[in-house]
């Protein structure tokens, strides 16, 4: 228990404690209010930072949205650029298609150029005349301008000479003036120097006198010294003046030289200014043209830039409007946020007031709570700062991406412009290439036309030369034929001599025939020995082939020979003199055939030498000539064998069968030669240009030759049947014309079947028709006439043509008519040989190589010659055969006039275009 005296102390202590507690409570409230203010300020700062972060976040979101929109625009721009690229590629493909169409059009134009050749030739002649006239006019103008130029040059030279004379006079005058002035100055200087020297001498004398009087006159010595000093000073002044005058003299010389040089420079400058004025005039003219072009280009560029600027400004206005709308929305959202924050602030103040009332009751818990909240806020601030740094980095990256996208967009725009420029340049390049190709094609066609015209003129000249040579040879052959006919006529008029006399006569004829040819034929014989060897080798090959290939009507001929009896014994017993005459005639025909074969080779050799094609392709030409030679030998051999058959006594149906078999064999040999040549061409391919030139026409020529050979076979069979009609036959013999006709029909069918594959293969094999061109030289006038008539008909009519059926044989007549038929057949064989010679010597059988150009008809002399021979060889009782031959020759003579009607004008072919 406390004492009573301690109560006031306790009360005082309580009062002190209450006051302390109140002071502590007031201090604590002050501290809490300060802390509350601090927390409020920190909260406001945090809220401000939060608002800034929210605004930054919203701004970043807007930036991202704008970037997405820009990316979408970029994607659309890239898609549009891709579409433009695809459109450009489509345009390029269309341009390629148009280029192909242009090539086709060029090909068509080339074909039209071929059709308009004659018009072009006329136009060329007119243009040539106009060019000559213009050339003469321009030459007159050039002469006039040359005279004007010479006059101007002469006047300028005269003016230059006058200026040179004036300059020389001025130079001489200046030099004279300068020399006179120099002489005056030198004279003056010399006078002054003399005066100075005189004064110097006088002063020296005075000095000497003064020196002499020095001892006596000391007072005068000082004066003399002073006068000496003055004299030295004057002397120095005079020397300085002399030096200055010398400098002036040098200056005058330099001035005169400078004046002369200035005058020369002025003259040179006048010339240079005249040249410069001319150059400046030209340059100004060029600069005006260039400035005009640059002005147009600048106007176009400024227009394009103005359009682009307008587009950019429109896009900028749209972007600014969108930005203003976004800013207004942000402002409204900020006002809403500010109202929300004010409400939240009032609520927070009320809450803080309630918290302040509760803090007084639980200070420790509040301190702990505040510390925890401070720590959490610090952590939040730190996280917000980190997020702010991240957002700033993201914003920087987005800005970099935006810059990169802008650069890519600018590069894409530049690429687009470059692509447009490349497209325009490509169009111009294509146009230029098309123009160049068209110009080159026109130049090539013109060069081809010129080359063809030159080649045509050269070939015409060479053909004229060969025709002259052939005419000379024909004159020689006419002389030989006339001599032979006269000799035979004389022998027949005086009677046939004995065999010994015949042998002597034949030897004499051989000597005459050897000595008679002219020196030209002898020279040609010496040149063609190598060709004869080749022809002999080919003849051997043809004989081997003829032995290998069986004739189609051999069985019929053998049956005919078996059914017919051998009339040789009876014939020898009946007419021995006539048989001897026939044998002698056969021997002479053999010898004559050899000479004619040599003449034919001599005729073919200059044609081969004069051919322009032999230089470009010698190997192919040699092979075709040897092949043609073999065909000639085969055909000539066939004619000789036919002549032998006609010369014998059994010259009736056996001779006709042999002739038909020989002609059928010749057709088979022709087909075989064509196939062999095709195989050879397959083994040795030619150049494409030569193949294009020669393939179509040579194949058509071979087909034409085959058809004409068939027609000749049919005509010869018909001719033989007519001859058999007029001839006499024994009663016991039977002639089988039906078998010959059947065999002939089979031969025609077989050759027609061979024609189809050969025609198909002829499209791919060149030079196969050169055999036909050589065989054309071996056919008779009837074949030539048939070629003229067939060229005007269609190929279908040629293939549908067939020989007429043979006529029935008549009853046999007397024995004399049989001898008449055999002799007429022999004369027909001789006529065939002469026709072969005439056709071989004519240029139409060798030079007929074009498709549309028909062959030239045989000369009328070639048709009249066999009639003379027939009249010379036939006996007086041969009117029927002679009339038949005369009709045949008359018909062949009238054919050239008909053939002229169906001839077409020659057409120059463009070998640059593929068929």
Curated annotation (Swiss-Prot):
GO cellular component, one term: centrosome
GO biological process, one term: G2/M transition of mitotic cell cycle
Keywords: Coiled coil, Cytoplasm, Cytoskeleton
UniProt-annotated stretches for the region Centrosomal targeting domain: 1-502
Coiled coil: 92-173, 214-422, 456-483, 521-548
Region (Disordered): 555-574, 606-653, 724-915
Keyword Coiled coil recorded: yes
Bias kind Low complexity: ranges: 628-652, 879-891
Microtubule binding domain: annotated span: 606-915
Record field: compositional bias (Polar residues): 613-627, 781-794, 819-830, 841-852
Biased composition (Basic and acidic residues): 745-758
Keyword Cytoplasm found: yes
Top-rank taxon, per record: Eukaryota
Main location per the UniProt record: cytoplasm
Compartmental location: Cytoplasm, Cytoskeleton, Microtubule organizing center, Centrosome; Cytoplasm, Cytoskeleton, Microtubule organizing center, Centrosome, Centriolar satellite; Cytoplasm, Cytoskeleton, Microtubule organizing center, Centrosome, Centriole; Cytoplasm, Cytoskeleton, Spindle
Function: Pleiotropic regulator of centriole duplication, mitosis, and ciliogenesis. Critical interface between centrosome and microtubule-mediated cellular processes. Centriole duplication protein required for recruitment of CEP63, CEP152, and PLK4 to the centrosome. Independent of its centrosomal targeting, localizes to and interacts with microtubules and regulates microtubule nucleation, stability, and mitotic progression.
Subunit comment: Interacts with CEP63; the interaction is required for their location to proximal end of centrioles. Interacts with microtubules.
Protein name: Coiled-coil domain-containing protein 57
Source organism (scientific name): Homo sapiens
Underlying gene: CCDC57
